[in-house]
Regions:
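N-terminal membrane-targeting/pre-transmembrane regions
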Residues: 1-42
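Generic detection of short hydrophobic beta-strand segments and adjacent strand-loop junctions
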Residues: 12, 17, 21, 103-106, ...
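Short, surface-exposed beta-strand/loop "edge" segments at domain boundaries and coil↔beta transitions
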Residues: 28, 82, 87-91, 128-133
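Conserved beta-hairpin
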Residues: 61-105
Length: 158
């Protein structure tokens, strides 16, 4: 999901910042992935059936490398747009092809906080109940996490 899509899909106001996986993790993943791709091409078997499997593996790795730079969250004027973690294996495979459907908007005034490992967001609904949104923000950079906390603190003190 892009910044423009986040603004159009949710009534979140202007997007102030996009959060991605830490750059070091992205580059490490890309280097390792490309090395594996080179090894796959170098040791490609001569049997056509095995060759098809190797090509499918190669496509899967390249697709995964492409997805490393996708946004995990957006800091907006009115709240956070977060990519929630799938609940089941079926949802996981659905999220590979329809990742934009897993973004949710949470208003700043409803946010209670994040769990210690950045795996869940705890928020309060309109009736006073608490709900938990599973997230994958553990690999987001420290500065981006602190920017998210600053935005929550800034808007919750109003």
């Amino acid at each position: 999901m892009t910044k423009q899509e986040a603004m159009e899909r949710f009534s979140s106001g202007a997007v102030q910042q996009s959060l991605e996986i830490h750059r070091g993790i992205q580059w490490t993943g890309r280097i390792v992935g490309l090395l594996v791709c080179v090894l796959i091409v170098k040791y490609l078997p001569s049997d056509w059936a095995e060759r098809i499997l190797y090509y499918l593996l190669l496509l899967l790795i390249l697709w995964t490398l492409h997805r490393l730079g996708e946004s995990q969250a957006f800091i907006c004027e009115k709240g956070l747009v977060l990519k929630r973690r799938p609940f089941s294996v079926k949802e996981y495979f659905h999220s590979l092809f329809h990742g934009d459907e897993y973004f949710v908007f949470v208003d700043y005034e409803h946010i209670i906080g994040f769990t210690e490992g950045w795996r869940e967001l705890q928020a309060m609904n309109g009736h006073g109940g608490i709900y938990v949104i599973p997230l994958d923000l553990a690999q987001v950079g420290y500065k981006d996490k602190m920017a998210m906390i600053e935005a929550i603190n800034k808007h919750s003190n109003l």
